[in-house]
A protein has these predicted regions:
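Membrane-proximal helix-turn-helix segments that form the acceptor-binding/catalytic region
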Residues: 22, 110, 114, 128, ...
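Nucleotide-activated donor-binding/catalytic signature segment of Leloir-type glycosyltransferases, i.e.
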Residues: 259-280
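Acidic donor-binding loop of glycosyltransferase active sites
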Residues: 286-296, 309-310
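Short alpha-helical donor nucleotide-sugar binding micro-motif in glycosyltransferases
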Residues: 275-276, 282-288, 304
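N-terminal subdomain of nucleotide-sugar transferases
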Residues: 1-45, 49-56, 239
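Donor nucleotide-sugar binding/catalytic pocket of nucleotide-sugar-dependent glycosyltransferases
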Residues: 119, 146-201
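Glycosyltransferase donor-sugar binding loop
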Residues: 189, 222-226, 247-260
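Conserved donor-binding/catalytic core segment of Leloir-type glycosyltransferases
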Residues: 4, 161, 213-229, 235-238, ...
Length: 382
C-alpha cells in the first residue's frame, strides 16, 4: 500500500524531530510504501532521493513566478510546480497532508476528485497562539483563503487532525471544518530512542554523568529558552525549596536576557547542559522524576509523556489539556514562582500522590504518546 505525505505548507528538512519527519518514518516501519512530496529552496529545480529511513522523497521544482515575490499575492500563488502530475505518476492509496495553508493543496483536491477511492487525511498545527487572529483582515483572509481550501478538502478527506485541543478548535472555528470531520491526533515521542527496557540503567548513567545523586528528586525542563517558557520562574521556585534532595536539570539554548538572568543561578543543585539534539533528550527524561513546562507549548511536552514521566504544565485555558491522561499531569493556570514551588513541594512531600501520577504516566499516558501508535491512528490502521 502506497502513502504520500504532502508537505507543502512548510519547507521539508531532513534530520529534524518534527511530526512530518517522524510519521513517514513510522509508516515505513509499518510496511507501507512511503513517499514524501515537498519542496526545498536549495533545490529550485527539484530532486528525488531515498533517505536513511527508507522514505522516497520528491522535492518539486519551485514556482519562480514574479508574483511569489509580492507580499500581498504570495499566499494566492502556488509554491511548487507539478504536484498534480506527481500524483498522477505515483497513484497513492493514501494521502496525508501536513498543513492545509498552501494554494498547491488544491492540486491534491483535483486529483482526489478524479480518484475517488484514495484515502485522504489532513493535519494542521495552526492555533490561536502561533497564528493569531489580531485583525479583521487576518480573520477574513484565513476564513476566505484557507477556509476555501479546507472546504475543498472536506469533500474528500476522511479526517482532519488537530494535534492539540486548541488546534482542533481552530480547525472548526477559523477554517470552518465540520466538527464530525475533526479529531485529535497528538504529537509524541519516537520510541526508537526511548530505551524503556533499560530505563533504570539509563537513569543511573545520566545521573552519574551530571553528578546528580541516585536518590535525588530530579526535575527537568528545557527547550528554546526565552521569557515565554517561564523557566526563569522555575529556577526561582526550585531555589526556594529547602529540601536539599531536589535537583533541576535544564537543557536548550537561552536567549541573551535569559542567559543573564539564569546562568548566575546555576549551581550545585541546578544543572544546565546547554543545547542537545532531540534524540539526546529522551535519556534525560528517563533519568528524571518530574517534567515541568511552565510556559509556551512545544513537542517536548509530549516527548516527556512518551517517556512515562509525570509532569506539571501551564494550563492554556484547556488548549493543551490532552497532556492529562487521567492523573499523570498537573495543569496550572496562574504560573508564578510561588505556584510552581507549591506544586513541586506537594509532590515531593506526598509520596502517595506522586506514585499515583507516576503509575498513570507509565502505564497509560506513555503508550498514548508513542509515535508508532500515533502513526497507526493517523491513517486508521490497527
Amino acid at each position: 500500500m502506497k502513502i504520500i505525505h504532502v508537505i507543502i505548507a512548510a519547507v521539508y528538512k531532513e534530520g529534524f524531530g518534527y511530526q512530518e519527519n517522524i510519521l513517514p518514518a513510522k509508516h515505513v516501519e509499518l510496511g507501507l510504501d512511503t513517499h514524501v512530496v515537498s519542496f526545498n529552496k536549495e533545490y529550485t529545480l527539484g530532486t528525488e532521493y531515498t533517505n536513511a529511513d527508507g522514505i522516497k522523497v520528491s522535492l518539486l521544482p519551485i514556482n519562480e513566478s514574479k508574483f511569489t515575490k509580492m507580499r500581498y499575492l504570495v499566499s494566492f500563488v502556488k509554491k511548487t510546480r507539478g504536484l498534480f502530475d506527481y500524483m498522477e505518476k505515483e497513484k497513492p492509496d493514501i494521502i496525508f497532508i501536513h498543513g492545509l495553508q498552501a494554494i498547491d493543496i488544491l492540486e491534491v483536491c483535483k486529483w482526489c476528485k478524479k480518484h475517488k477511492n484514495v484515502k485522504l487525511y489532513v493535519d494542521q498545527h495552526a492555533d490561536y497562539y502561533n497564528s493569531p487572529i489580531n485583525k479583521l483582515t487576518t480573520l477574513l483572509y484565513y476564513k476566505i483563503v484557507y477556509g476555501y481550501i479546507a472546504k475543498q478538502l472536506s469533500k474528500y478527506a476522511i479526517k482532519f487532525w488537530g494535534v492539540t485541543p486548541w488546534r482542533v478548535d481552530y480547525l472548526q472555528k477559523v477554517y470552518g471544518v465540520k466538527q464530525k470531520k475533526i479529531d485529535l491526533l497528538v504529537m509524541g515521542g519516537d520510541e526508537k530512542y526511548i530505551d524503556w527496557g533499560n530505563r533504570n540503567f539509563v537513569r543511573e548513567t545520566i545521573r552519574k554523568k551530571y553528578d546528580i545523586p541516585q536518590n535525588a528528586f530530579l526535575v527537568i525542563s528545557g527547550g528554546k529558552i526565552d521569557e515565554t517558557k517561564n523557566i526563569h520562574l522555575l529556577i526561582d521556585a526550585v531555589e526556594k525549596i529547602k529540601n536539599k534532595n531536589i535537583y533541576l536539570l535544564i537543557f536548550g539554548n537561552m536567549t541573551t536576557d535569559m542567559e543573564e538572568y539564569c546562568k548566575p543561578k546555576i549551581n550545585g543543585n541546578i544543572k544546565y547542559v546547554g543545547w542537545i539534539s532531540s534524540k539526546q533528550v529522551y535519556p534525560l527524561f528517563l533519568a528524571s522524576d518530574l517534567s515541568v513546562f511552565p510556559g509556551t507549548h512545544s513537542v517536548l511536552w509530549e516527548q516527556s509523556l512518551a517517556c512515562g514521566l509525570p509532569g506539571i504544565f501551564k494550563d492554556w485555558n484547556g488548549g493543551f489539556n490532552h497532556v492529562d491522561c487521567g492523573g499523570n499531569a498537573i495543569l496550572i493556570k496562574n504560573i508564578t514562582e510561588d505556584t510552581l514551588n507549591e506544586n513541586i513541594q506537594l509532590l515531593m512531600d506526598n509520596k502517595a500522590m506522586y506514585d499515583k501520577m507516576k503509575d498513570i504516566a507509565e502505564y497509560k499516558a506513555r503508550e498514548h504518546f508513542l509515535y508508532i501508535n500515533i502513526a497507526k491512528k493517523a491513517i486508521d490502521i490497527k
